[in-house]
């Protein structure tokens, strides 16, 4: 068994920056979003299933998934969203387990944007939340993605609340300030997680 630290945060919170800081310290990072893209790569069985269910127009000329079109299709249709989740979630879970088993670092950092929404925090040994104010989320996401405030507000409304994320957190990184502060926070937590992982391994041994 591998000690798992789940990392989450709302859109624009800086999850990638924090994950990269852990990776720089030699920790294997398993990113749920990357895995979700991998299972629908051109030629993947799941991509064919999506095309069969939603129509061939969901596939671009280069064979890739038309993500925006699919998002728009399921956004206001719970039944279609449930169908897609039933298809993809088992595949994502399977690949996640494979990557955890292949990990070589003392603990793994599992990056899951929808950790709270899908109750996945129960699968982790510890939960780290990257926390920022909603206003910071709005500004960063508008700047990064070149989208309107209204668009970001819709995304925020569909995600778990800040309070819900903090309620499941074991550790919190406040990312409202300068990016430089992240490195020291990550270094401190890394040292702590190494201790926890070592204790976990010793308890697992017969």
Swiss-Prot record:
Localization per Swiss-Prot or TrEMBL: Cytoplasm
GO molecular-function terms, A-Z: ATP binding; dephospho-CoA kinase activity
Reaction equations catalysed: 3'-dephospho-CoA + ATP = ADP + CoA + H(+)
UniProt-listed InterPro entries: Depp_CoAkinase, P-loop_NTPase
CDD domains: DPCK
Pfam families, sorted: CoaE
Positions annotated to bind ATP: 12-17
Pathway(s) this gene product operates in, as recorded in its UniProt entry: Cofactor biosynthesis; coenzyme A biosynthesis; CoA from (R)-pantothenate: step 5/5
One biological process term in Gene Ontology: coenzyme A biosynthetic process
Keywords: ATP-binding, Coenzyme A biosynthesis, Cytoplasm, Kinase, Nucleotide-binding, Transferase
Annotated DPCK domain residues: 4-200
EC number from the UniProt entry: 2.7.1.24
PROSITE patterns in the cross-refs: DPCK
GO cellular component: cytoplasm
Broadest EC class assigned to this enzyme: transferase
HAMAP family registered for this protein in UniProt: Dephospho_CoA_kinase
The protein's role, per its UniProt record: Catalyzes the phosphorylation of the 3'-hydroxyl group of dephosphocoenzyme A to form coenzyme A.
Alphabetized NCBIfam families for the sequence: dephospho-CoA kinase
Family, similarity comment: Belongs to the CoaE family.
The protein, known as: Dephospho-CoA kinase
Organism of origin: Escherichia coli O6:H1 (strain CFT073 / ATCC 700928 / UPEC)
Upper taxonomic lineage: Bacteria, Pseudomonadati, Pseudomonadota, Gammaproteobacteria, Enterobacterales
